[in-house]
Amino acid sequence: MVKLPHIYEEIDIPENVTVEINGLKVKVNGPKGSIERDFSHVRNIILRKENSKIIVETFFADRRKKALVGTIASHIENMIKGVLKGYRYKLKIIYSHFPITVEVDDRNRIVRIKNFLGEKSDRIAKIIGEDVKVTVKGEDIIVEGIDIEHVGQTAANIELATKVKDKDRRVFADGIYIYDWGEEE
């Protein structure tokens, strides 16, 4: 197998974003907030900052190291986009007979789903991360934040909390479903 001598990716840093690199720890500050991430579990990858660019590189890379360079570069790009614009997931509450009520408990960091399929007990979904904000507007649930992984996992937790088991999904279509996601406008 051929090992390439030098693999690297460059990430441009926008003007209103500051990036601090300490070894393999990256902290990104921007208008929406700051995100810190530790990549110290990754071996043989070098992170450095030159002028207004971040360089992720490795030497004598095999297939796995080459993939890691791209993965870490993508994580850092997502951090930069998050502190600049933020991320938003939109979910739709769908029911046919029993009206579903959704309440957000910010103190306990949970979303409480009541009266799903007429059930007496509430279904609970965890809100991941301190920076994630969940709001309910009529039939829509909006999950917003600066960390794409926390926002996406929170939306997935809400969707999975209303999963229907042992019934035909074509007939029992009740639930909460993700219908739109991406960067905030």
Swiss-Prot record:
Keywords: Ribonucleoprotein, Ribosomal protein, RNA-binding, rRNA-binding. Gene3D superfamilies: Ribosomal protein L6, alpha-beta domain (3.90.930.12). Pfam families: Ribosomal_L6. GO terms for molecular function: rRNA binding; structural constituent of ribosome. One of its GO terms (biological process) is cytoplasmic translation. One of its GO terms (cellular component) is cytosolic large ribosomal subunit. InterPro entries: Ribosomal_uL6-like, Ribosomal_uL6-like_a/b-dom_sf, Ribosomal_uL6_a/b-dom, Ribosomal_uL6_arc. It comes from the Archaea. The keyword Protein transport does not apply. The keyword 4Fe-4S does not apply. Belongs to the universal ribosomal protein uL6 family. HAMAP family: Ribosomal_uL6_A. This protein binds to the 23S rRNA, and is important in its secondary structure. It is located near the subunit interface in the base of the L7/L12 stalk, and near the tRNA binding site of the peptidyltransferase center. Part of the 50S ribosomal subunit. This is Large ribosomal subunit protein uL6. The gene is rpl6.
